[in-house]
């Protein structure tokens, strides 16, 4: 049996090797290791010519700005490079033993770095107004915040009122406008709770005790179950005050209510529904708005600080280019620009409302006539009752570039794919902190990626492509900017980029195969479309990689099963004998999503703040 096992195991390894490396097949048909897409090479056809920026003709930026960019084409992928010929023009600048060819793969060296700025992906919900999820409480559907990233500097402004939204909601005989949005006082106190208080409260909870302060605050708010419904997945949002180190649970999930039909701005009418809106205000700089879904690794995957000496751009075949079509506003400083971006960012606020009796009118009538059914049928936020439940999924004008010299804020809704090194700019997002900045532009990114790609190709071609005279072939990637001009393998003398703190050089004499359209979309130029005709327009197919992974996994599983069967038969037999003794196995572990005690809401048998809804529909009395 052991011989059989060895034979099968060796066969499995050989099968795996054949799948991944092949026996004489064309190596360019297989993906790179640790890369989603293999970077094959096509015949080099890029003869030096006078450099032209491939941006749309309506682009108005100065040439020196464009030269500092590094952008990538995300939807143009490699094709076969069999029969690639060296470019004579490129050989002249290098030693006689080097033959330089240019890859046709338009990859993006910024992909990993820029992942956190793909807000639709990393946040996945509204920013200005976040109501991206629905949840049921006691048989009624509600909307609630669901963004996966913290929103720094976000708060709620109550119109024509000195009441802060972090004040507890009105209870008992208080007028509506005497209260804010936060949880009412409880015994023991659950909101606001200090950071040290939360640490102490969850010190024995392995899942929570070591979380950072923002994630801990989010989980603490999610510990409260509305309306004694332990099966509900409704979780309250929260705001963390970084200055006071306190976590405030928000009793009201609504973030916007404006217009005469829905609220009354008259301060004298204290018991009417108040108007409010989300904002990034000076007084909110220490606040961070949190949903129940904030990920515990947000520091790695979400943007926080603004990027100094940088502006967002689009990767366009080897260089990062300006985004040609933006909305430009005046802004005195970074804070004002960040505030403008936030105001235009993704929003889940409903766009349609009932034609007759509105939600807020129902609420007011319910209070006035003590009609509990009217209160129960209504629901914050505005328009959620018989109205559209619009979800932005994070799509909006979420990015901006602030020019410190011209005091202009350039806002756009296309996902940036790279950064331009420019000493005049600060790159910001709607999620980012309104004033915090970091200055650590990755100047060596291009050089490192160029060297990595050249080394990767060299390993693949090995000695097979060396000619009889011992000349060495170099496959240069399509990266035409670097802080090391020799690494560019440029057929002409690279030019230094102006306003660059990294001292970048750009190669302008290699023809670019992509350009930016009028809607900020990067596309392959018309004359090169035939070469990329068989390549998917937006994303590469990963069928081959999936087959390889699945086959390798199957072989590994087979080998593991054989090993277990041959060497642990006796141990397994003993375990099978115990199957009739369930008492020996103990209790099952609880689910992670039930890790917090639902009774920790501290309400006990006392009357809750609301018996009908997770948000303010009737005044609780204590």
UniProtKB/Swiss-Prot annotation:
Keywords per UniProt: Disulfide bond, Glycoprotein, Malaria, Membrane, Signal, Transmembrane, Transmembrane helix
GO cellular component, one term: membrane
UniProt signal peptide: 1-24
Compartment(s) of residence: Membrane
Membrane topology: Single-pass type I membrane protein
Superkingdom of this protein's organism: Eukaryota
Residues spanning the membrane: 547-567
Extracellular face of the membrane: 25-546
Coiled coil: none
Disulphide bonds in the chain: 149-302, 217-247, 263-275, 320-418, 337-409, 443-502, 490-507, 492-509
Family matches, as SUPFAM superfamilies: Apical membrane antigen 1
One Pfam family recorded for the sequence: AMA-1
Cytoplasmic side of membrane: 568-622
Family (UniProt): Belongs to the apicomplexan parasites AMA1 family.
Function: Involved in parasite invasion of erythrocytes.
Protein name: Apical membrane antigen 1
Taxonomic lineage: Eukaryota, Sar, Alveolata, Apicomplexa, Aconoidasida
């Amino acid at each position: 049996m052991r011989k059989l096992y060895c034979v099968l195991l060796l066969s499995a390894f050989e099968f795996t090797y054949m799948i991944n490396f092949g026996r004489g097949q064309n190596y360019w048909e297989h993906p790179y290791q640790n890369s989603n897409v293999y970077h094959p090479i096509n015949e080099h056809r890029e003869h030096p010519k006078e450099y032209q920026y491939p941006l749309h003709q309506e682009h108005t930026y100065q040439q020196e700005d464009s030269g500092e960019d590094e952008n990538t084409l995300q939807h143009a992928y490699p094709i076969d490079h069999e029969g690639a010929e060296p470019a004579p023009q490129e050989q002249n600048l290098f030693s006689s033993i080097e033959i330089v060819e240019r890859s046709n793969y338009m990859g993006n060296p910024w992909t990993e770095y820029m992942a956190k700025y793909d807000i639709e992906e990393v946040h996945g919900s509204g920013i200005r107004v976040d109501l991206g999820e629905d949840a049921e409480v006691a048989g009624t559907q509600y909307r609630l915040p669901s963004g996966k990233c913290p929103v720094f500097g976000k708060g709620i402004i109550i119109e024509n009122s000195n009441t802060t939204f972090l004040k507890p909601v009105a209870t008992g005989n208080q007028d509506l406008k005497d209260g804010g949005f936060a949880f009412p006082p409880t015994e023991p106190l659950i909101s606001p709770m200090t950071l040290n208080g939360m640490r102490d409260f969850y010190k024995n909870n392995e899942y929570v005790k070591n979380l950072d302060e923002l994630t801990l605050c989010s989980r603490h708010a999610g510990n409260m179950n509305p309306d004694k419904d332990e099966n509900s997945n409704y979780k309250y949002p929260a705001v963390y005050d970084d200055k006071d180190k306190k976590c405030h649970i928000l009793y009201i999930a609504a973030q916007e209510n404006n217009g005469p039909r829905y609220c009354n701005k008259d301060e004298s009418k204290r018991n009417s529904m108040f108007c409010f809106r989300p904002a990034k205000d000076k007084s909110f700089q220490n606040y961070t708005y949190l949903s129940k879904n904030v990920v515990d690794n947000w520091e790695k995957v979400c943007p926080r600080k603004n990027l100094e000496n940088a502006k967002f751009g689009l990767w366009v075949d080897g260089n990062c280019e300006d985004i040609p079509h933006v909305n430009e506003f005046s802004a005195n400083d970074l804070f004002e620009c960040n505030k403008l971006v936030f105001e235009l960012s993704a929003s889940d606020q409903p766009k349609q409302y009932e034609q007759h009796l509105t939600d807020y009118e129902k609420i007011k009538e319910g209070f006035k006539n003590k009609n509990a059914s009217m209160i129960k049928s209504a629901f914050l936020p505005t328009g959620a009752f018989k109205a559209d439940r619009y979800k932005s999924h994070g799509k909006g004008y979420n990015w901006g570039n602030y020019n410190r010299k011209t005091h202009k804020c350039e806002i756009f809704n296309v996902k940036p794919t790279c950064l331009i090194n420019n000493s005049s700019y600060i790159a910001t997002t709607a999620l980012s902190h309104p004033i915090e900045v970091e200055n650590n532009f990755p100047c060596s990114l291009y050089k490192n990626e160029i060297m990595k790609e050249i080394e990767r190709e060299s390993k693949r071609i090995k000695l097979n492509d060396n000619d009889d005279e011992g000349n060495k072939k170099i496959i240069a990637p399509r990266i035409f900017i670097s802080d090391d001009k020799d690494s560019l393998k440029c057929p002409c003398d690279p030019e230094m980029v102006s306003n660059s703190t990294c001292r970048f050089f750009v190669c302008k004499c290699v023809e670019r195969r992509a350009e930016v359209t009028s809607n900020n979309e990067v596309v392959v130029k018309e004359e090169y479309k035939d070469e990329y005709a068989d390549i998917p327009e937006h994303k590469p197919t990963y069928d081959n990689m999936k087959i390889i992974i699945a086959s390798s996994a199957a072989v590994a599983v087979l080998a593991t099963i054989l090993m277990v069967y041959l060497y642990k038969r006796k141990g397994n037999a003993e375990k099978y004998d115990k199957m009739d003794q369930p008492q020996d196995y103990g209790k099952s572990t609880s689910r992670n999503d039930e890790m917090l005690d639902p009774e920790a809401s501290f309400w006990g048998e006392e009357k809750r703040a609301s018996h009908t809804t997770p948000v303010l529909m009737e005044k609780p009395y204590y």
